[in-house]
Swiss-Prot record:
Subunit: Homodimer.
Catalytic activity: (E)-cinnamyl alcohol + NADP(+) = (E)-cinnamaldehyde + NADPH + H(+); (E)-coniferol + NADP(+) = (E)-coniferaldehyde + NADPH + H(+); (E)-sinapyl alcohol + NADP(+) = (E)-sinapaldehyde + NADPH + H(+); (E)-4-coumaroyl alcohol + NADP(+) = (E)-4-coumaraldehyde + NADPH + H(+)
Cofactor(s) of this protein: Zn(2+)
Function statement: Involved in lignin biosynthesis in the floral stem. Catalyzes the final step specific for the production of lignin monomers. Catalyzes the NADPH-dependent reduction of coniferaldehyde, 5-hydroxyconiferaldehyde, sinapaldehyde, 4-coumaraldehyde and caffeyl aldehyde to their respective alcohols.
Residue sites binding Zn(2+) 2 per the record: 101, 104, 107, 115
CDD domains from the UniProt entry: CAD1
Record-given protein name: Cinnamyl alcohol dehydrogenase 4
């Protein structure tokens, strides 16, 4: 197939239908391939902790049926007449955002992820009024502006986590000028995002300390991920050893936790960068901030430009994600294991290698 703008296309994925979060086969339709669209056959898709929040309606904004998945790697099957960046056969990626207004300050600054009218890759409504559905499916149609090329020679299953976990770490390091060799950084939480934080920061030449709630992952962090140090956050003596020593901490923890112990670890002008999606208010005492001119900031995924940069960076440095592949009919088991933190460190669903059996009612969304 070449440059075609045909009718709607059928897709088959796995969807959650209610806040139980249980996924099952689901048939639906995609919009026709528009002039700026890329029609993609999904090869694989990473599982992010945010997917749990969405399928379980933890944020109170879920719409069902919902096909999750926003770390999507696939092959281009068809392109619209105005598509110039991609051709049939290209291996491409799609992340968290698939639309934006294009005219606000974030959009004009190539920071489309901060657009107030951004469109999520799933659990949202596209400009044509149709629900967006994610990458736990056989196909997707995405505007070319929100598609990136996967570097030649990069394994598809390794590329998938970089589209969210990887760029989520890379973006604040780039934005805050924290890419220089010799910095001392902390990674709080060693999950899918945290493990990429260790690898990327080490590749930038940083001294990296992993901060975790127990010592269960100490050997893994140092022996396999390359961390320089490991501190158990519940050990006061260990935390005291870190006092006033770190240039930054990347906080990936997605549940409530006090910030005071980590603010105390930062140097003058140190930065605590929050990434976990938490609906419970966090707390800290202001002297820890004002007496060290410290910064508490948030950072949300990364832009398309930054996604391209992190893919190129990881290819250049030979960085790989630590993953476990599963078939699509193992999604519910994988989600349950992820809830229990029973994965090292990212699940990637082998969509193309799965048997997408059509068992469910069809919708015309």
């Amino acid at each position: 197939m070449g440059s075609v703008e045909a009718g709607e296309k059928k897709a088959l994925g796995w969807a959650a239908r209610d806040p139980s979060g249980v996924l099952s086969p689901y048939s639906y339709t995609l919009r026709s391939t528009g002039a700026d669209d890329v029609y993609i056959k999904v090869i694989c898709c990473g599982i992010c902790h945010t997917d749990i929040h969405q399928i379980k309606n933890d944020l109170g904004m879920s719409n069902y049926p919902m096909v999750p998945g926003h770390e999507v790697v696939g092959e281009v099957l068809e392109v619209g007449s105005d598509v110039s960046k991609f051709t049939v056969g290209d291996v491409v990626g799609v992340g968290v955002v698939v639309g934006c207004c294009g005219s606000c300050k974030p959009c004009s600054s190539e920071l489309e992820q901060y657009c107030n009218k951004r469109i999520w890759s799933y659990n949202d409504v596209y400009t044509d009024g149709k629900p967006t559905q994610g990458g736990f499916a056989d196909t997707m149609i995405v505007n070319q502006k929100f598609v990136v090329k996967i570097p030649e020679g990069m394994a598809v299953e390794q590329a998938a986590p970089l589209l969210c976990a990887g760029v989520t770490v890379y973006s604040p390091l780039s934005h805050f000028g924290l890419m220089a060799s010799g910095l001392k950084g902390g990674i709080l939480g060693l999950g899918g995002v945290g493990h990429m934080g260790v690898k990327i920061a080490k590749a930038m030449g940083h001294h990296v300390t992993v901060i975790s709630s127990s010592d269960k992952k100490k050997e893994e962090a140092i022996e396999h991920l390359g961390a320089d140090d490991y501190v158990v956050s519940s050990d006061p003596a260990e935390m005291q050893r870190l006092a006033d020593s770190l240039d930054y901490i990347i906080d990936t923890v997605p549940v409530f936790h006090p910030l005071d112990p980590y603010l105390a670890c930062l140097k003058l002008d140190g930065k605590l960068i929050l990434m976990g999606v938490i609906n419970t208010p966090l707390q800290f005492v202001t002297p820890l901030v004002i007496l060290g001119r410290k910064v508490i900031s948030g950072s949300f995924i990364g832009s398309i430009k930054e996604t391209e940069e992190v893919l190129a960076f990881c290819k250049e440095k030979g960085l790989t994600s630590t993953i476990e592949t599963v078939k699509i009919d193992e999604l519910n088991i994988a989600f349950e294991r992820l809830r229990k933190n029973d994965v090292r460190y990212r699940f990637v669903v082998d969509v193309a290698g799965s048997n997408l059996v059509e068992e469910a009612a069809t919708t015309t969304n």
